[in-house]
Amino acid sequence: MKDFPIAISLLFALLSPVLLPCSGDSTGGVEDDSPATVCIVGSGIGGSSVAHFLRNYSVSTGLNQAKILMFERHEIVGGRMRTVTVAGDTFEAGGSILHPKNYHVKDFVERFNLTVRLPTPIEESSAIGIWDGKRFVVKTFGSGTKFPFLDTIVSWVNDLYLFLRYGLSLLRMSSFIENTVDNFLKYYESLESRPIFDNVEGMLKWSGLYNLTKLTLQEKLSEAQLSPLLVNELVTVITRINYGQSVLISGLAGAVSLAGSGGGLWSVEGGNWQMAAKLINHSDVTLHLNEKIESISYLENHYELKSTKGNSYKCDVTVVATPLDEVDIQFSPTISIPKRELQHTHTTFVRGLLNPGYFGMKSLSDVPALVGTLEDPLIPFSCISILRKYSKTDMTYKIFTRQPASDSLLDELFSRRTETVRIDWGAYPKYHAPEVFAPFILDDHHLYYVNAFENAASTMETSAVAGENIARLIISRFMTKESLSSSDKRSCSSGLHSDS
């Protein structure tokens, strides 16, 4: 959901239990020579990544001929990666931005020759305002002139303005983000040095990220000696935009949110959902669209999946790659996972013209292109941003709210509306500290849960990282007589693989 162009890249320099080795012992497995059937529930980046890595990592194992069935309850693939069309233009409505060090999704884009979309000049040069409900407590200058020298001067002025307001806390925040990113990069190390994890806690402890889930972002930033002013203003704006929540989210989710607001951000031209579509198409998957799985039952040595279409499927391995928090799937035997709520973000796209009077301004040019807000229940929106300018009186905007945006609110915010599109997303978990995690393995057999990792952080890349681990976990546990050979491990060593 993180799509708002945030022109604050100038602030950032950048943004253990070892359980099962790649050649580890296996449990359960194939008892005959027939190909195994792997069923994946959910076609988002998590589920499609599992399919992709299963195909790439099981070349010389008994799973290399596995049949992969994928079930998607909607009519298109992509999960929470969706686009919306407003007045003929396509915009990201779900998972929207990618970090320059999101190496799995970068590999997907390069592998399938997808086109990278970089921020437009208006996005990179947009002025930012922080609204407290009555006035702008922070307001930077926009650039984007035809003269690069003038743009540089404006950037320096904004630098100085923010430094005078927040001081050395800006540098401490940059260091906090960089340390988190460096730890996350351990998930791309060679497979020889990177274990397979059967629980989220072990995965986070190994990378040095677990302690960030034990305290809130506010507490972690206080430990890092950031000023309360910076936390209550700029950091709050970022967490409200990227996760729809306050600085009381867990420290790890907050750090990921901050990293998603720096420079070098990008997306896929035409929609990020294309990554999932390409992964599925190139992984020899039998795709069942518009088919909702309503029950998953373990029957002696296999799973039976039943759908709302009345169909039944026999599966040796089942992977749940959709949040179980708002999906009604009956499990037999029952499973036990911690209760978790999803944070709903209401996204509204409006083509029209913002009302400067709402912000106490006489001219629209006085209103920043991105308006973020402080944590105040009386403020009815999290942020408003210009997505596209057609003319001085005709633009497309994107608004995030925690509650549905009523017509009366939109009529206050806009002087004119020609088109309005509303979307309600169960976007990501409601983060707390300390976090409690569901297991990757939901039973004693082969029922796996990709979205257990979402309680650490929810992004397209973290879903791909979790999907890769699940694929390795399936291979290591499923095989009774075989394990990944040395040659296989060498072919996997980069974590980013070429099709065979």
Curated annotation (Swiss-Prot):
Q: List the cofactors.
A: FAD
Residues with attached carbohydrate: 56, 113, 211, 281
Q: Which SUPFAM superfamilies match?
A: FAD/NAD(P)-binding domain
GO MF, one example? farnesylcysteine lyase activity
Q: Which residues cross the membrane?
A: none
Compartment annotation: Lysosome
GO terms for biological process, alphabetical: abscisic acid-activated signaling pathway; farnesyl diphosphate metabolic process; prenylated protein catabolic process; prenylcysteine catabolic process
Task: Give me the reactions it catalyses.
Answer: S-(2E,6E)-farnesyl-L-cysteine + O2 + H2O = (2E,6E)-farnesal + L-cysteine + H2O2
Give one Pfam family: NAD_binding_8
The superkingdom listed in its UniProt entry is Eukaryota
* Assigned GO CC terms: lysosome; plant-type vacuole
Q: In which tissues is it expressed?
A: Expressed in seedilings, flowers, stems, leaves and roots.
E.C. number? 1.8.3.6
Q: What does this protein do?
A: Involved in the degradation of prenylcysteine. Cleaves specifically the thioether bond of S-farnesyl-L-cysteine and has no activity with S-geranylgeranyl-L-cysteine. Also recognizes N-acetyl-farnesylcysteine and may have a role in deprenylation of farnesylated proteins.
Relay the record's extra comment.
Plants with decreased levels of farnesylcysteine lyase exhibit delayed germination and hypersensitivity to abscisic acid.
Q: What is this protein called?
A: Farnesylcysteine lyase
From what organism does this protein derive? Arabidopsis thaliana
